[in-house]
Amino acid sequence: MAPLFRFETEAEVIEAANTTIVGLASCFCARDHARIIRVHEGLEYGMVGVNTGLVSTEVAPLGWVKQSGLGREGSRHGIEDYLELKYICTGF
């Protein structure tokens, strides 16, 4: 069971969705590609599903924002959190 809400504008949807203190995942339905991009960019969530539930794969980063925590797991983005990046410049 999931609650459904009706909104008049995209701005209302984004504002209502972003009022939560956590930001692990969100899903929404839309047909228009430009609308999908606008809403996705406005949402403060680590993962966003469009017209589907979220499917986890080894190439998809699992991430959090807000009080869900910070960081990424999975994919190269998650691996990079565990690496120490160094730069070296040598001349011979």
Which ranges hold each PLM region?
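Conserved C-terminal structural/oligomerization subdomain of aldehyde/semialdehyde dehydrogenase
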Residues: 1-92
